[in-house]
Amino acid sequence: MAISIYNDFSDYMLFKGIKNVQTTDFKYKNIDVDITEDLVIKQFDAIYDFHQKSWGFNGYLRNRLNNNTGKIIEEYKIYIKKLVSDINNIKRDEPKNPFEELIIEYGEGAVKRGQACISAVYQTDYIGIISRSMKRNEVCLGNTDFQNLQKENYTYVVSFEHCSYNVVEMDCFILLSKLRRKGAKLDFQRLAREFCYIEGLDTSSSEFITALVSYPHEFMKCCNKYREGKNKDYEDRFYKKLSKALIQDGDSLF
Protein backbone atom coordinates (compact mmCIF):
# COMPACT_ATOMS: atom_id res chain seq x y z
CA MET A 1 0.00 0.00 0.00
CA ALA A 2 1.44 3.37 -1.06
CA ILE A 3 2.13 5.94 1.65
CA SER A 4 0.96 9.49 0.94
CA ILE A 5 3.65 12.16 1.30
CA TYR A 6 2.96 15.76 2.32
CA ASN A 7 5.25 18.68 3.06
CA ASP A 8 3.20 19.81 6.06
CA PHE A 9 0.20 18.56 7.99
CA SER A 10 -1.73 21.54 6.65
CA ASP A 11 -1.41 20.03 3.15
CA TYR A 12 -3.09 16.87 4.40
CA MET A 13 -5.90 18.84 6.06
CA LEU A 14 -6.52 20.78 2.86
CA PHE A 15 -6.75 17.43 1.07
CA LYS A 16 -9.34 16.33 3.68
CA GLY A 17 -11.51 19.37 2.98
CA ILE A 18 -10.45 21.93 5.60
CA LYS A 19 -10.28 25.39 4.03
CA ASN A 20 -7.27 27.64 4.63
CA VAL A 21 -8.34 31.32 4.82
CA GLN A 22 -7.17 34.74 5.96
CA THR A 23 -8.24 36.01 9.39
CA THR A 24 -10.01 38.97 7.75
CA ASP A 25 -12.62 36.51 6.48
CA PHE A 26 -13.78 35.69 10.01
CA LYS A 27 -16.83 37.16 11.71
CA TYR A 28 -15.41 37.07 15.25
CA LYS A 29 -12.02 38.75 14.94
CA ASN A 30 -11.86 40.02 18.51
CA ILE A 31 -11.81 37.56 21.40
CA ASP A 32 -13.09 40.32 23.70
CA VAL A 33 -16.52 40.45 22.07
CA ASP A 34 -19.37 39.06 24.13
CA ILE A 35 -18.92 35.32 23.82
CA THR A 36 -21.99 33.25 24.67
CA GLU A 37 -22.12 29.58 25.61
CA ASP A 38 -24.02 28.86 22.40
CA LEU A 39 -21.19 30.43 20.40
CA VAL A 40 -18.62 28.32 22.26
CA ILE A 41 -20.63 25.16 21.58
CA LYS A 42 -20.74 26.10 17.89
CA GLN A 43 -16.96 26.40 18.05
CA PHE A 44 -16.85 22.89 19.50
CA ASP A 45 -18.54 21.67 16.30
CA ALA A 46 -15.73 23.22 14.27
CA ILE A 47 -13.12 21.63 16.53
CA TYR A 48 -14.82 18.24 16.20
CA ASP A 49 -14.87 18.49 12.41
CA PHE A 50 -11.14 19.21 12.44
CA HIS A 51 -10.57 16.24 14.77
CA GLN A 52 -12.63 13.87 12.62
CA LYS A 53 -10.69 14.82 9.51
CA SER A 54 -7.31 14.54 11.24
CA TRP A 55 -7.78 11.24 13.11
CA GLY A 56 -5.76 8.28 11.95
CA PHE A 57 -3.25 10.13 9.80
CA ASN A 58 -0.59 7.59 8.79
CA GLY A 59 1.09 9.35 5.90
CA TYR A 60 4.59 10.82 5.75
CA LEU A 61 5.35 14.46 6.56
CA ARG A 62 8.55 16.13 5.44
CA ASN A 63 7.99 18.58 8.32
CA ARG A 64 6.81 16.26 11.05
CA LEU A 65 4.36 17.09 13.82
CA ASN A 66 5.50 17.49 17.41
CA ASN A 67 4.07 15.11 19.99
CA ASN A 68 2.81 17.22 22.91
CA THR A 69 0.91 14.46 24.70
CA GLY A 70 1.19 15.03 28.45
CA LYS A 71 3.43 18.08 28.01
CA ILE A 72 1.17 20.62 29.71
CA ILE A 73 0.65 18.35 32.74
CA GLU A 74 4.39 17.98 33.26
CA GLU A 75 4.91 21.73 32.81
CA TYR A 76 2.22 22.50 35.38
CA LYS A 77 3.86 20.13 37.86
CA ILE A 78 7.21 21.87 37.37
CA TYR A 79 5.61 25.30 37.89
CA ILE A 80 4.29 24.14 41.27
CA LYS A 81 7.69 22.85 42.40
CA LYS A 82 9.38 26.10 41.37
CA LEU A 83 6.79 28.22 43.17
CA VAL A 84 7.24 26.16 46.34
CA SER A 85 10.97 26.85 46.10
CA ASP A 86 10.33 30.57 45.54
CA ILE A 87 8.10 30.78 48.61
CA ASN A 88 10.68 29.04 50.78
CA ASN A 89 13.46 31.33 49.53
CA ILE A 90 11.42 34.49 50.08
CA LYS A 91 10.45 33.39 53.57
CA ARG A 92 14.08 32.67 54.39
CA ASP A 93 15.43 35.97 53.05
CA GLU A 94 12.35 38.15 53.77
CA PRO A 95 10.31 39.80 50.97
CA LYS A 96 12.32 42.45 49.11
CA ASN A 97 9.43 44.20 47.35
CA PRO A 98 5.60 44.30 47.09
CA PHE A 99 5.64 41.54 44.46
CA GLU A 100 7.36 39.11 46.82
CA GLU A 101 4.94 40.14 49.58
CA LEU A 102 2.10 39.07 47.28
CA ILE A 103 3.86 35.74 46.72
CA ILE A 104 3.93 35.17 50.47
CA GLU A 105 0.28 36.18 50.81
CA TYR A 106 -1.19 34.16 47.94
CA GLY A 107 1.52 31.74 46.82
CA GLU A 108 0.67 28.85 49.13
CA GLY A 109 -2.97 29.06 48.05
CA ALA A 110 -1.89 28.88 44.41
CA VAL A 111 0.30 25.87 45.19
CA LYS A 112 -2.54 24.03 46.92
CA ARG A 113 -4.92 24.82 44.09
CA GLY A 114 -2.40 23.71 41.47
CA GLN A 115 -1.74 20.48 43.36
CA ALA A 116 -5.49 19.84 43.62
CA CYS A 117 -5.82 20.30 39.85
CA ILE A 118 -3.00 17.87 39.09
CA SER A 119 -4.43 15.39 41.59
CA ALA A 120 -7.83 15.69 39.89
CA VAL A 121 -6.21 14.97 36.52
CA TYR A 122 -4.71 11.73 37.82
CA GLN A 123 -8.01 10.74 39.42
CA THR A 124 -9.55 10.68 35.95
CA ASP A 125 -8.76 7.87 33.53
CA TYR A 126 -5.69 9.84 32.44
CA ILE A 127 -3.78 6.80 31.18
CA GLY A 128 -6.87 5.64 29.31
CA ILE A 129 -7.22 9.08 27.70
CA ILE A 130 -3.61 8.96 26.49
CA SER A 131 -4.01 5.37 25.29
CA ARG A 132 -7.11 6.27 23.27
CA SER A 133 -5.32 9.27 21.77
CA MET A 134 -2.35 7.17 20.68
CA LYS A 135 -4.54 4.46 19.14
CA ARG A 136 -6.47 7.03 17.10
CA ASN A 137 -3.42 9.15 16.23
CA GLU A 138 -5.29 12.17 17.56
CA VAL A 139 -4.10 15.59 16.40
CA CYS A 140 -4.91 18.91 18.07
CA LEU A 141 -5.19 22.19 16.19
CA GLY A 142 -3.59 23.96 19.15
CA ASN A 143 -5.12 27.36 18.37
CA THR A 144 -8.88 26.93 18.63
CA ASP A 145 -10.01 30.50 19.25
CA PHE A 146 -12.42 32.45 17.09
CA GLN A 147 -9.71 34.20 15.08
CA ASN A 148 -8.23 30.92 13.87
CA LEU A 149 -11.13 28.50 13.43
CA GLN A 150 -14.68 28.75 12.16
CA LYS A 151 -17.31 26.48 10.67
CA GLU A 152 -20.08 27.46 8.27
CA ASN A 153 -20.65 25.32 5.18
CA TYR A 154 -17.03 24.24 5.53
CA THR A 155 -14.51 24.32 8.36
CA TYR A 156 -12.05 27.19 7.94
CA VAL A 157 -8.61 27.51 9.56
CA VAL A 158 -6.22 30.46 9.39
CA SER A 159 -3.07 28.78 10.74
CA PHE A 160 -2.05 25.17 11.28
CA GLU A 161 1.31 26.04 12.87
CA HIS A 162 0.35 24.81 16.36
CA CYS A 163 -0.90 21.38 15.24
CA SER A 164 0.56 18.49 17.23
CA TYR A 165 -0.17 14.96 18.32
CA ASN A 166 -2.09 15.32 21.58
CA VAL A 167 -5.27 14.23 23.34
CA VAL A 168 -8.26 15.99 21.73
CA GLU A 169 -9.36 17.28 25.15
CA MET A 170 -6.51 19.80 24.96
CA ASP A 171 -8.19 21.73 22.15
CA CYS A 172 -11.17 22.31 24.43
CA PHE A 173 -8.96 23.21 27.38
CA ILE A 174 -7.01 25.76 25.34
CA LEU A 175 -10.20 27.53 24.24
CA LEU A 176 -11.93 27.51 27.64
CA SER A 177 -8.81 28.52 29.53
CA LYS A 178 -8.27 31.52 27.27
CA LEU A 179 -11.90 32.61 27.58
CA ARG A 180 -11.78 32.29 31.36
CA ARG A 181 -8.61 34.36 31.64
CA LYS A 182 -10.21 37.00 29.40
CA GLY A 183 -13.03 37.32 31.94
CA ALA A 184 -15.82 35.52 30.06
CA LYS A 185 -18.71 34.68 32.41
CA LEU A 186 -19.50 31.14 31.32
CA ASP A 187 -20.36 27.81 32.92
CA PHE A 188 -17.04 26.15 32.14
CA GLN A 189 -17.97 22.81 33.70
CA ARG A 190 -21.09 22.61 31.54
CA LEU A 191 -19.08 23.57 28.46
CA ALA A 192 -16.53 20.83 29.19
CA ARG A 193 -19.40 18.33 29.31
CA GLU A 194 -20.88 19.69 26.07
CA PHE A 195 -17.54 19.31 24.30
CA CYS A 196 -17.25 15.72 25.44
CA TYR A 197 -20.81 14.98 24.31
CA ILE A 198 -20.01 16.31 20.83
CA GLU A 199 -16.74 14.35 20.67
CA GLY A 200 -18.26 11.15 22.08
CA LEU A 201 -16.06 11.21 25.20
CA ASP A 202 -16.98 10.15 28.73
CA THR A 203 -17.16 11.98 32.07
CA SER A 204 -13.50 11.24 32.75
CA SER A 205 -12.60 13.54 29.86
CA SER A 206 -14.84 16.38 31.05
CA GLU A 207 -13.34 16.12 34.54
CA PHE A 208 -9.86 16.17 32.98
CA ILE A 209 -10.68 19.38 31.10
CA THR A 210 -12.26 21.03 34.16
CA ALA A 211 -9.19 20.25 36.28
CA LEU A 212 -6.86 21.91 33.76
CA VAL A 213 -9.09 24.97 33.28
CA SER A 214 -9.12 25.43 37.07
CA TYR A 215 -5.31 25.51 37.30
CA PRO A 216 -3.96 28.97 38.37
CA HIS A 217 -2.29 29.50 35.01
CA GLU A 218 -1.81 33.28 35.11
CA PHE A 219 -0.41 33.30 38.66
CA MET A 220 2.15 30.65 37.77
CA LYS A 221 3.07 32.34 34.49
CA CYS A 222 3.68 35.67 36.22
CA CYS A 223 5.88 34.02 38.87
CA ASN A 224 7.85 32.24 36.14
CA LYS A 225 8.51 35.49 34.27
CA TYR A 226 9.63 37.23 37.46
CA ARG A 227 11.93 34.35 38.37
CA GLU A 228 13.48 34.19 34.90
CA GLY A 229 13.74 37.94 34.39
CA LYS A 230 17.24 39.34 34.13
CA ASN A 231 16.17 42.86 35.09
CA LYS A 232 14.64 43.04 38.55
CA ASP A 233 13.93 46.78 38.26
CA TYR A 234 10.36 46.09 37.19
CA GLU A 235 8.92 44.94 40.52
CA ASP A 236 6.04 47.42 40.26
CA ARG A 237 5.06 46.05 36.85
CA PHE A 238 5.20 42.46 38.12
CA TYR A 239 3.17 43.44 41.18
CA LYS A 240 0.40 44.81 38.96
CA LYS A 241 0.51 41.72 36.73
CA LEU A 242 0.30 39.35 39.68
CA SER A 243 -2.60 41.32 41.15
CA LYS A 244 -4.35 41.02 37.78
CA ALA A 245 -3.53 37.30 37.60
CA LEU A 246 -5.45 36.67 40.82
CA ILE A 247 -8.55 38.04 39.10
CA GLN A 248 -7.93 36.29 35.77
CA ASP A 249 -7.55 32.85 37.35
CA GLY A 250 -10.88 33.24 39.16
CA ASP A 251 -12.10 30.75 41.74
CA SER A 252 -11.44 27.03 41.67
CA LEU A 253 -13.96 25.06 39.61
CA PHE A 254 -14.13 22.20 42.11
What spans do the regions from the language model cover?
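ATP-binding pocket architecture of kinase catalytic cores
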Residues: M1-I73, K77
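ATP-dependent phospho-/nucleotidyl transfer catalytic cores
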Residues: Y28-D34, R64-V139, R190
